[in-house]
Amino acid sequence: EALRSRYLDNGMLDFLLKEREAGRIRNLGFSYHGDIEVFDYLLSRHDELKWNFVQIQLNYVDWRHAKEVNTRNTDAEYLYAELVKRNIPAVIMEPLLGGRLSRLNDHLMARLKQRRPQESVASWAFRFAGTFPDVLTVLSGMTYMEHLQDNLRTFSPLVPCTEEEF
């Protein structure tokens, strides 16, 4: 209902499509937040609308356990697979699950450090999100210079997660 009233019935989506056609919008997409019916509906119109990207929440918890975090969420594995089927690039939000994946308990941190002692805990989450081939970009909120430096080490160049690490 919100999609219909905010973007469809008032002509907003038609306006955005015309702006893209006129060259004032280069890439048109949407950010998905929760309602799977809306996600599926918008993707079902991809042949007509030609989405340039879709922003989804993807991290190693939400990959198969999204509903355990929030019952309204959909597993990122499903969301990503639907984008891949349609050749729509994914923009990734929440790779750290609101920072929670950068602050693990001692047992989990020790397991990660045992495998890759030089890497931060956050870098594991970024590497996971960046491993998938149809990911256009991974968004990262950075507050401090050390966050930026860690991100540069993680993504320059990105070392994808191995099968074992998955």
Where do the protein language model's features map onto the residues?
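Beta/alpha (TIM)-barrel catalytic core signal, keyed to glycine-rich beta->alpha loops juxtaposed to Asp/Glu
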Residues: 1-166
